[in-house]
């Protein structure tokens, strides 16, 4: 059966999905000669998985975001029989075009097909009339993009970036091993649970290299609805020429995401579309120090041997404004440093020639991630604000599902993306 032979039988009927059990050569001095580090955190126990398809079992608490081009609302909800907090994504299938329905089908079937702790899980999928309901674990920290907006507007520390990227790239490596290109690797598609588990979402953009039982070396399909993800897309994907693109396109997106996490801003974000495309396709190779690719700000990067060093040689000093966030444990100093290993990682990912970029497996062996071998999954928690584990006592559940009428205004930024 093709991966696109989804369980979405029609616009108004979806069969319930329930989870079922089921060393590369160094290319750079910073890519160590060892097998890829693998420390997958445990996935949810069977007793914790919510499989109910009865809509009355879910008490919607609050809308926490939207996605899928504003067609999907994302809610924090309580599974009343167990008291477990879950995420409920609700999409009106009648509002979806055929292309969007195919994207939904792809996300639903692939979430069921893939089983990896660093890939976002759908516990169950069902319909209520023409509304598609997707039940998944509640990720208490939301997305890395939301963390940037709320707590780290000037960018994250190198240690936090390492923890987040390591988990996300592990999920990406799993997809690549299964012959799939993600095509939408970015901070808003990286989710973090309350216990520090990092997962990769955004499967609706995914494309398979497998066709008729054979794995192709390149694909030529241009992703639908790509306008919002263009800053992260690779030059060869945007070029749309006879050479096509492959999994190395995702590695370029990892480099852009690393810059996004480090600066708090998306490279190319404020550029006119034509200017962005020209710079990616014809411009000279750039690095995290190339301020011309970032939105205008007061932040300035410069080389320095002073300041707090990360422990790996000479550091790069980033001047930012001092600010204190809501948690006493979080404080962004007036200067933060990035090691040569971090810049090596970014520059490797942003190579214009995709053949010069490392694979996801090789990237996990990069010296930037070397410390992850000695750190546990919960080592990320001291770097984050307190997790949102339960609704506030003053927060009242929204109206019963039968009384809700969903209208999604265009002026609200999505916190989570489908």
From Swiss-Prot:
User: Principal localization?
Assistant: nucleus
Report the residue ranges that make up the Protein kinase domain in this protein.
58-369
Q: Which InterPro entries match?
A: Kinase-like_dom_sf, Prot_kinase_dom, STRAD_A/B-like
A single GO BP: protein export from nucleus
GO MF terms held by the record: ATP binding; protein kinase activity; protein serine/threonine kinase activator activity
Q: Which residues bind ATP?
A: 64-72, 89
Q: Where in the cell is it found?
A: Nucleus; Cytoplasm
> Gene3D superfamilies annotated for this entry?
Phosphorylase Kinase, domain 1, Transferase(Phosphotransferase) domain 1
Cellular component GO terms held in the UniProt record: aggresome; cytoplasm; cytosol; nucleus
Source organism, top-level taxon: Eukaryota
Keywords, A to Z? ATP-binding, Cell cycle, Cytoplasm, Nucleotide-binding, Nucleus
Pfam families annotated for this entry?
Pkinase
Q: How does it assemble?
A: Component of a trimeric complex composed of STK11/LKB1, STRAD (STRADA or STRADB) and CAB39/MO25 (CAB39/MO25alpha or CAB39L/MO25beta): the complex tethers STK11/LKB1 in the cytoplasm and stimulates its catalytic activity. Interacts with BIRC4/XIAP. These two proteins are likely to coexist in a complex with TAK1, TRAF6, TAB1 and TAB2.
Family per record: Belongs to the protein kinase superfamily. STE Ser/Thr protein kinase family. STE20 subfamily.
Function, as annotated, reads:
Pseudokinase which, in complex with CAB39/MO25 (CAB39/MO25alpha or CAB39L/MO25beta), binds to and activates STK11/LKB1. Adopts a closed conformation typical of active protein kinases and binds STK11/LKB1 as a pseudosubstrate, promoting conformational change of STK11/LKB1 in an active conformation.
Question: What does the comment on domains in this protein's record state?
Answer: The protein kinase domain is predicted to be catalytically inactive.
What the entry lists under PANTHER family is as follows: SERINE/THREONINE-PROTEIN KINASE FRAY2, STE20-RELATED KINASE ADAPTER PROTEIN BETA
Name of the protein described by the UniProt record:
STE20-related kinase adapter protein beta
């Amino acid at each position: 059966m093709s991966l696109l032979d989804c369980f979405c039988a029609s616009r108004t009927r979806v069969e319930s999905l329930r989870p079922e059990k089921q060393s590369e050569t160094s290319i750079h001095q910073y890519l160590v000669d060892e097998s890829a580090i693998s420390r997958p955190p445990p996935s949810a126990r069977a007793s914790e998985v919510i499989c109910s398809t009865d809509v009355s079992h879910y008490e919607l608490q609050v809308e926490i975001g939207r996605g899928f081009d504003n067609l999907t609302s994302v809610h924090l909800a309580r599974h009343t029989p167990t008291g477990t907090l879950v995420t409920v994504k609700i999409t009106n299938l009648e509002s979806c075009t055929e292309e969007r329905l195919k994207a939904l089908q792809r996300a639903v079937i692939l979430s069921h097909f893939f089983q990896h702790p660093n890939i976002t899980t759908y516990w169950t999928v069902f319909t209520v009339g023409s509304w598609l309901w997707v039940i998944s674990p509640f990720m208490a920290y939301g997305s890395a993009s939301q963390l940037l907006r709320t707590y780290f507007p000037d960018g994250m520390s190198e240690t936090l970036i390492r923890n987040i990227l390591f988990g996300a790239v592990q999920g990406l490596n799993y997809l690549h091993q299964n012959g799939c290109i993600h095509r939408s690797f970015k901070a808003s598609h990286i989710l973090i649970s309350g216990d520090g588990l990092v997962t990769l979402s955004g499967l609706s953009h995914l494309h398979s290299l497998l066709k008729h039982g054979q794995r192709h070396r390149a694909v030529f399909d241009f992703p639908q609805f790509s306008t919002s993800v263009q800053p992260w897309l690779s030059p060869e994907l945007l070029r749309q020429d006879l050479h096509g693109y492959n999994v190395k396109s995702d590695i370029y997106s990892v480099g852009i995401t690393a810059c996004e996490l480090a600066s708090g801003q998306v490279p190319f974000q404020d550029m006119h579309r034509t200017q962005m495309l020209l710079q990616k396709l014809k411009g000279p190779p750039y690095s995290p120090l190339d301020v011309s690719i970032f939105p205008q700000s007061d932040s300035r990067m410069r080389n320095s041997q002073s300041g707090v060093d990360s422990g790996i040689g000479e550091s790069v000093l980033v001047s930012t404004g001092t600010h204190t966030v809501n948690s006493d444990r979080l404080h962004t100093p007036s200067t933060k440093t990035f090691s040569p290993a971090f810049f090596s990682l970014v520059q490797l990912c942003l190579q214009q020639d995709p053949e010069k970029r490392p694979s996801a497996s090789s990237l996990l062996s990069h010296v930037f991630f070397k410390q992850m071998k000695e750190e546990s999954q919960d080592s990320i928690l001291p770097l984050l604000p307190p997790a949102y584990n339960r609704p506030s006592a003053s927060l009242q559940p929204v109206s019963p599902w039968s009384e809700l009428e969903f209208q999604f205004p265009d002026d609200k930024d999505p916190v989570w993306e489908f």
